Curated annotation (Swiss-Prot):
Belongs to the cytochrome P450 family. Its EC number is 1.14.14.-. This is Cytochrome P450 2C23. It comes from Rattus norvegicus (Rat). It is found in: Endoplasmic reticulum membrane; Microsome membrane. InterPro entries: Cyt_P450, Cyt_P450_CS, Cyt_P450_E_grp-I, Cyt_P450_sf, Cytochrome_P450_fam2. Induction: Constitutively expressed. Up-regulated by fenofibrate. It catalyses: (5Z,8Z,11Z,14Z)-eicosatetraenoate + reduced [NADPH--hemoprotein reductase] + O2 = (8R,9S)-epoxy-(5Z,11Z,14Z)-eicosatrienoate + oxidized [NADPH--hemoprotein reductase] + H2O + H(+); (5Z,8Z,11Z,14Z)-eicosatetraenoate + reduced [NADPH--hemoprotein reductase] + O2 = (11R,12S)-epoxy-(5Z,8Z,14Z)-eicosatrienoate + oxidized [NADPH--hemoprotein reductase] + H2O + H(+); (5Z,8Z,11Z,14Z)-eicosatetraenoate + reduced [NADPH--hemoprotein reductase] + O2 = (11S,12R)-epoxy-(5Z,8Z,14Z)-eicosatrienoate + oxidized [NADPH--hemoprotein reductase] + H2O + H(+); (5Z,8Z,11Z,14Z)-eicosatetraenoate + reduced [NADPH--hemoprotein reductase] + O2 = (14R,15S)-epoxy-(5Z,8Z,11Z)-eicosatrienoate + oxidized [NADPH--hemoprotein reductase] + H2O + H(+). Transmembrane segments: none annotated. A cytochrome P450 monooxygenase involved in polyunsaturated fatty acids (PUFAs) metabolism and signaling. Catalyzes preferentially the epoxidation of double bonds of PUFAs. Converts arachidonic acid (ARA, C20:4(n-6)) primarily to stereospecific products 8R,9S-, 11R,12S-, and 14S,15R-EET. Plays a major role in the formation of EETs and hydroxy-EETs (HEETs) in kidney. Via EETs may inhibit the epithelial sodium channels (ENaCs) in nephron segments, preventing excessive sodium absorption during high dietary salt intake.
Length: 494
């Protein structure tokens, strides 16, 4: 027993010494990195962060250290970019050097470097190019992408009509619609909202979305080499990701039986055709594991982000009934109450378009982009960032910039309207990030938000259960995403 105790103590001391040595070695090179608060061994700058509101902590540090500074999450340095000028300079002007994907261990450990979002190098380029082309040429089958979204908008309205103007929580049903659009893209089919298979898929996606924003997952990302061997929520998280991948692979088996390369029906068909096309290439990136992870990425990125934006949008329109009234007036005047909205209507709906943009700006759904990494030793301003260093561009610092938006903390569609009431574009609108690592589904997300939003407002008036002034619209802030507070509403048919 004494020998066991001594061995355990020696192991703990060794790990501690190695960690201290690692920090010390990194600190020796800090002269090349931007300035920042001095890190402590093992925990880095954790004490400078409010884990319940990391974006606010990062903005506060920018006031002290400037728009480019270094922060240690655990033992690893991260360069934080705060403000439009430095974010643009890094992601656009020096985009090729900042092209890497920084680590997010809770995801990396399950994706193993495959897929669209957390891959790097040539694999990432191949998967992104294929996915962009597939989505862009989505005349697969007999329906365009817009027609698929319009169909889902109609189904969403039918489902919402069943609430009969009674109070309900919109969280689940607003997630069903974008999830079904991804189902349509991936395997050319949609589900009824009460389908058991669909409900199980929604449950997997929702639980992991909630969990990736938890403090536990943030702890895992700081010390993955230790926590991965402990019991905890990360095990359930990984199991659910595997379940989503297995669900996709079952659909792949069905597609393999009826594949016609000359007439691809969906994303899976296109991917299977590429697998066949490159079957003699031993280094091909087109294989079933990559297909499963790409499909999982599309579900994760394409379901909860869109539904959360819609949910936040409805809450804001109840908070500001005068804005809702103006949207109703414009929709009635331009489209009427019976013609389904289409993308060609967008140019004729400047106020509605401004409201949609302001919702996305105001909520800053993703306060920072997913982490980047420099792919080589990179000269940036007065600093040299070593190859592989994580870089965190703060999108909220761009969309809440007082130089561009007169009242950035206030919800005001006027931020996107000129003096004539026409829609006004701005380079400071970056909810999908910037550069080559910008969201691959940006065009789809924009289409979904416009068609779902206009269809809902065309058919319903939004009624709050309390006085508008008493509605809480303060986001539930975490390290990764901003969520609206829970609420119920009544949808009154128009």
């Amino acid at each position: 027993m004494e020998l066991l105790g001594f061995t355990t103590l020696a192991l703990v001391v060794s790990v501690t010494c190695l960690s201290l040595l690692s920090v010390w070695t990194k600190l020796r090179t800090r002269g090349r990195l931007p300035p920042g608060p001095t890190p402590l061994p093992i925990i880095g700058n954790l004490l400078q962060l409010n884990l319940k509101d990391i974006p606010a902590s990062l903005s506060k540090l920018a006031k002290e250290y400037g728009p480019v500074y270094t922060l240690y999450f655990g033992t690893s340095p991260t360069v934080v970019l705060h403000g439009y000028d430095v974010v643009k300079e890094a992601l656009l002007q020096q985009g090729d050097e900042f092209l890497g994907r920084g680590p997010l261990p809770i995801i990396e450990d399950t994706h193993k470097g495959y897929g669209l979002i957390f891959s790097n190098g040539e694999r990432w380029k191949v998967m992104r190019r294929f996915s962009l082309m597939t989505l862009r040429n989505f005349g697969m089958g007999k329906r365009s992408l817009e027609e698929r979204v319009q169909e889902e908008a109609r189904c969403l309205v039918e489902e919402l009509q069943k609430t009969k103007a009674q109070p309900f929580d919109p969280t689940f049903i607003l997630a069903c619609a974008p999830c079904n659009v991804i189902c349509s893209i991936l395997f050319n089919d949609r589900f009824q909202y009460n389908d058991k298979t669909f409900l199980n898929l929604m449950d997997l996606l929702n639980k992991n979305f909630q969990q990736v924003n938890s403090v536990w997952c943030q702890m895992y990302n700081l010390w993955p080499t230790i926590i991965k061997y402990l019991p905890g929520k990360h095990i359930e998280f990984a199991k659910r990701i595997d379940d989503v991948k297995n669900f996709i692979l079952e659909k792949v088996k069905e597609h393999q039986k009826s594949l016609d390369p000359a007439n691809p029906r969906d994303y899976i068909d296109c991917f299977l055709s590429k697998i066949e096309e490159e079957k003699d290439n031993l280094k091909s990136e087109f294989h079933l594991e990559n297909l499963a992870v790409c499909g999982s990425n599309l579900f994760t990125a394409g379901t909860e982000t869109t539904s959360t934006t819609l949910r936040f949008g409805l809450l804001l329109l109840m908070k500001y009934p005068e804005v809702q009234a103006k949207v109703h007036e414009e929709l009635d005047r331009v489209i009427g109450r019976h013609q389904p909205p289409s993308m060609k209507d967008k140019m004729k709906l400047p106020y509605t378009d401004a409201v949609l943009h302001e919702i996305q700006r105001y909520i800053t759904l993703l306060p920072s982009s997913l982490p980047h990494a420099v792919v080589q030793d990179t000269k940036f301003r007065d600093y040299v960032i070593p190859k592989g260093t994580t870089v965190l561009p703060m999108l909220s610092s761009v969309m809440l910039d007082q130089k561009e938006f007169a009242n950035p903390e206030k919800f005001d569609p006027g931020h996107f309207l000129d003096k004539n009431g026409c829609f006004k574009k701005t380079d400071y609108f970056v909810p999908f990030s910037l550069g080559k690592r910008a969201c691959v589904g940006e065009s789809l997300a924009r289409m979904e938000l416009f068609l779902f939003f206009t269809t809902l407002l065309q058919k319903f008036s939004l009624k709050t259960l309390v006085e508008p002034k008493d509605l809480d619209i303060k986001p539930i802030t975490t390290g990764i995403i901003n969520l609206p507070p829970p609420y119920k509403l009544c949808l009154v048919p128009r």
